Each structure stands twice: as C-alpha cells, then as structure tokens.
C-alpha cells in the first residue's frame, strides 16, 4: 500500500488520501509521479495476476499498458463515491489488459466454459470430463479470457451460496448429455424471460416446478434432477457475468 508518510515534503500532514488524488487531478505532476512510483509494486502485481509470471515484467508491453491504465484510473476516479481507489484502479488495469490481450491473442485463446460450447462432443459419460476440467480449465493459463472467466466463477460461487449450493454440487450434478444441457439452458431462459417465474424463483430460492410443468409441459422429475444446474444457469443469465453468459447464449444459438 502507498506510504503516505513519504509525502510530507509534498503536502500538509493533515491532507487525506483523497486530497492527494484531488491535488493530482488538479495538475500536481510532481505528486502524480511520486504517487505512481509508490504504487508500482501494486501495478506489477496486477499485471502478474493476469498474464502470469514472466521474466522482467517491468519491460513488458503489459506493464506499460498497466501504468497508463493506472494513470487513467487517477483521472477518472470519482472522489465523491465510496469506492476505494485501490479496487477501482485494479478494475481499470484489468479491463485495459484484457482488451490488449484479446487483441493480440484472440486466435490463441483457450475457450473456458467449453462444457456448454463443445458442439463436437457427444457428451456421453466416457467423453465428458469433470466440472473443474470443463469449467475452470488450466489455472496457469495467461490468456485474458481465462482470467476473466475465473473471476466470474468466483462471483458465481458467491451467488449460488444464497441458494444453498456449492461449486462441488455443480461438479456432481452437471448433466452429461448435450440434449439435457440444452434442455436445462432453455428452462433457465424461460425463467429469466418471464418476470413472474423469475420472481417466484428468486423468492422461493428454488425452481417454480408447478408453473413450469403446467404452463410448459415440462417433466417435474427432470426439473428436480437438474435443479442445481438450472439454478446456476438462471443466476448466470440474470447477472453481469458476461463471459459465462456468452457461452450459454452461443450454445442456444443466439
């Protein structure tokens, strides 16, 4: 974290952290340079988390982009909001690096969430790998889309906890056959597109079985068997988890 004590020659001791940023935004370039220098270990860590450890990251294009992004974060940071600057700047750096990596490695990106997008697979018991292999892919990959999906899966874990589910539950209950997967995704889509059904789902923390069976002629046994998987898909489709959502819509042909 930044050492405010090192700014005593540049500012009054009573100046707050926000006041430092305010002065930088007002044009104090000496303070800006000192501020960025003190944050370089943090910036370097952000780069390392996304692209993996490389020799001399400080000489990399990714690090240069991260420095520019950090400077951008200073300029765009809203002093009146409660968002912490460190969290805000990390998100700006992440977005800029992801944009860069997508543009330079778009032809080499390993597809996360391939479980939903594997159109060439028969999805039988022998050919379908476990949930972690299909959903979480190689944790050491340095591709931007992997990183973004990893972050989204962490957020998904928090969402499904509210429905008394865990990622381990999804490992066990994920359907093995493509037809079943498509059926579950379509059921999830029905729920999110019908406000009354979604409200029931959200309030009860479970699927609206009666309404789905009566209105859409769906088999209750199938719904119950795949409840956790369908629930997770509803939560993704109703969220801002854009990478995971994209693969669902790709599978549905949208």
Curated annotation (Swiss-Prot):
GO terms for biological process: DNA-templated transcription initiation. A motif (Polymerase core binding) lies at residues 61-74. Negatively regulated by the anti-sigma-I factor RsgI8. Pfam families: Sigma70_r2. GO terms for cellular component: cytoplasm. Residues 209-228 bind DNA. It comes from the Bacteria. GO terms for molecular function: DNA binding; sigma factor activity. It is found in: Cytoplasm. SUPFAM superfamilies: Sigma2 domain of RNA polymerase sigma factors. Keywords: Cytoplasm, DNA-binding, Sigma factor, Transcription, Transcription regulation. Sigma factors are initiation factors that promote the attachment of RNA polymerase to specific initiation sites and are then released. Belongs to the sigma-70 factor family. SigI subfamily. HAMAP family: Sigma70_SigI. Interacts with RsgI8. NCBIfam families: PRK08311.2-1 (NF006173), spore_sigI (TIGR02895). This is RNA polymerase sigma factor SigI8. It comes from Acetivibrio thermocellus (strain ATCC 27405 / DSM 1237 / JCM 9322 / NBRC 103400 / NCIMB 10682 / NRRL B-4536 / VPI 7372). The lineage of its organism: Bacteria, Bacillati, Bacillota, Clostridia, Eubacteriales.
């Amino acid at each position: 974290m930044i050492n405010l004590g090192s700014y005593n020659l540049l500012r009054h001791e009573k100046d707050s952290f926000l006041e430092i940023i305010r002065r930088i935004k007002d044009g104090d370039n000496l303070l800006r340079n000192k501020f960025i220098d003190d944050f370089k270990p943090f910036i370097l860590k952000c780069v390392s988390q996304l692209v993996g450890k490389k020799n001399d990251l400080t000489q990399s294009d990714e690090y240069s982009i991260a420095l520019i992004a950090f400077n951008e974060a200073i300029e765009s940071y809203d002093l009146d909001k409660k968002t912490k600057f460190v969290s805000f700047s990390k998100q700006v750096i992440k977005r800029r690096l992801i944009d860069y990596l997508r543009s330079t490695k778009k032809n080499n990106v390993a597809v996360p969430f391939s479980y939903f997008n594997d159109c060439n697979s028969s999805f039988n018991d022998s050919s379908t790998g476990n949930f972690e292999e299909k959903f979480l892919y190689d944790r050491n990959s340095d591709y931007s889309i992997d990183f973004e999906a990893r972050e989204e899966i962490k957020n998904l874990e928090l969402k499904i906890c509210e429905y008394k589910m865990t990622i381990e539950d999804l490992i066990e209950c994920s359907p093995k056959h493509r037809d079943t997967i498509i059926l579950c995704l379509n059921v999830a889509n029905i729920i999110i597109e019908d406000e009354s059904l979604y409200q029931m789902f959200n309030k009860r923390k479970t699927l609206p079985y009666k309404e789905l069976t009566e209105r859409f002629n769906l088999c209750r046994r199938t719904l119950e068997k795949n409840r956790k998987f369908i629930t997770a898909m509803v939560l993704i489709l109703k969220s801002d988890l854009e990478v995971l959502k994209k693969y669902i819509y790709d599978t549905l042909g949208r």
